[in-house]
Every structure is written in structure tokens, then in C-alpha cells.
Amino acid sequence: MEVTKGIILGEYDVIVEGEGESLDDRKSIPEILEDRGLDPKLVSSLITGPDASGTERSLLSWSEGQSDFSGEDRTLALLVHGPVDCDQLDYLLRDSHFTGVKHGVVDHNRLIECLRSQSGDIVVEQGGLSSLEGMLVARGLMYSAVYFHRVTRVTEVMLSRAVERAGDNLPDSLDLQRRVDAEIWAELDKVGGFSRDMVTRLKYRNLLKVCLSRRKEDMTQEQVERLAKAANNLAERRELEDDIAYRAGLEPGYVAIDVPSVKLLLSEPRMAQVDVKILGDDGKTRWLKEVTPMAEALRRRQVSQEAVYVMTTSGNERRVSEIAQKILFE
């Protein structure tokens, strides 16, 4: 988030040092904004929006941070971070296209036509209700089918562990932000060892296997709290992972514990916290839940069926599963 704001303000360059010489007439984002009469500071302030709470917008709670936003007219900020914002419409359509999963196809043109600003807030005209419902359903389905799919989780964990265990052998985090995927993979390959092995496995789709998973309702409160604590503490999580790996006769790193969302464990939030306002044909504004029963169904729908995954290399699933069961759940 701070990097994004820095780019808009001109405090952070997205080009690796020395590469700018190969680009002709390059303009920074603040220069482009100022050429069009826009204040970079105002634009950067919209990044955190009323629903972002000063960080990346919570994907599980639309209203988080709303009370911390000061200002009368929130229209622009809500278009960036809100119940119906440009980011959601963009990533649903884009990710649906590139993954081939059609759940994310929404009638974005109709929905945009029905967006209105009312008293500094964003509302949806009743004529766009079907399009809004379609977007909310699409969002929920995309999270289940793509973003929280177990294979997605496995690949993300493998890459994150490769970076995590590379330690100081990688360029600093700000420098990595300037790199494209291929460059980051090349850096991980140069590190060697575990990091090289993980990116090689990703390259040839020799992925880690999920050997144990649990739903929240299948765990005791003590188990839930322990997993949540470990997920929030890098050292504690790595200690658990490496303990299981050692007992299974594996090298450190070849057992991974993944908690897709700690919030799912602690408070069981739902994908659709129904804080969308509908402008009726009678001119009155109502909450979505007052207009359609679908809102309540969406609110109750869980993002991920599984609260925790334990992963390891192929051929070691049974042994790791038995050990992880004893350490984590007994």
C-alpha cells in the first residue's frame, strides 16, 4: 500500500536502476496527473479509501475501517475501495478470462450505469439489482473456485516459502517490487537449495500435496487459537513446520502449514457483508438485505471450506499426515 502511494507521489520509482536510460520521454505518474490538472496527493489519499483501514482492503469485510475515514463526500474513495468498486469489477473479469473460470463474468456495464452518488455515498439503482446480485455471486464463486482453491493455495505457499527461506540472499523487498515474475524466479534460482527446488517444482508442476486439512467446525477452540497464533507468527509457524518435517525424516521447508485466512478461524467472516445501498424506484434508500433474500444467503456463505492445510512432497503424505495430526490436533 505504501509503495503504491509512493509511486503516485513520485517518491518511489518502478524502474530498476539503470533501466530508465533505455526509455525515451518517460514521465512519472505525478507528472502525468499534474499535466491533467489532478493533485497527486489527493489521488494517493484515495488508495486507502474508507473501507481500506489504511492497508490493503480486506477481502473478507467490506466495512472494515469505515469509521476511520474522515471527509464528507466519499464517492471517489468508494469507487476505489467500496462495496461495489472498480477493483472488484476489474479483477473478477480479468481473472475469469485468464483462468477460464466463467464464474467471474458479470454485467459490469449495466452495474456501472446504475451507480449513483447520494449524500457522499455510492448507491445502486434498483434497476441494477440483478447485475449487483450477479457480481456478488460471481465474487463468492471466484473465491471458492480460484482464489481459495487448494491448488492455488499450494502454488502460493510454495512461492512464498521459497522467498521466505531465501532470507538475505535476495534483493531487498523494495527492489523485488520492481521486478517482473521471470526476474524474481531467476533470483530465487540463483539462491539455490530449497528456493531453487521450489521454483523448479513450480516450473514443472511438481507441486506439494495436501496431506491433511481441517474445517473450523472440526477443531476445538484451543486448536483454532493455536493455529491462528502460529499463522500470525513466522518463527512459531516455521518451528511447527520444521518439527513435523524432522519427525518425518524430511529436510526443513518440505512441510508447510497454510491457514488461508486467519480471520476465517477467529471470527468466521462471510464473503458478503451486505453493506450495499439500493436506491429504490420510490426514491428511498434501503440496504441490500432489505430488498433481496439473496443478501442473507451470500452473507452466510463461507469463503473457504477448509480452515487449514498441511502440505508436503509427493510420497510422504501419509507419514506427514500422521505426525501433523498428533502435533496439531491431539
Show where each model-derived region lies.
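Terminal helices and disordered tails flanking the catalytic cores of nucleotide-processing hydrolases
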Residues: 151, 160, 170-330
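Sequence-structural signature of the catalytic-core scaffold of metal-dependent phosphohydrolases
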Residues: 1-214
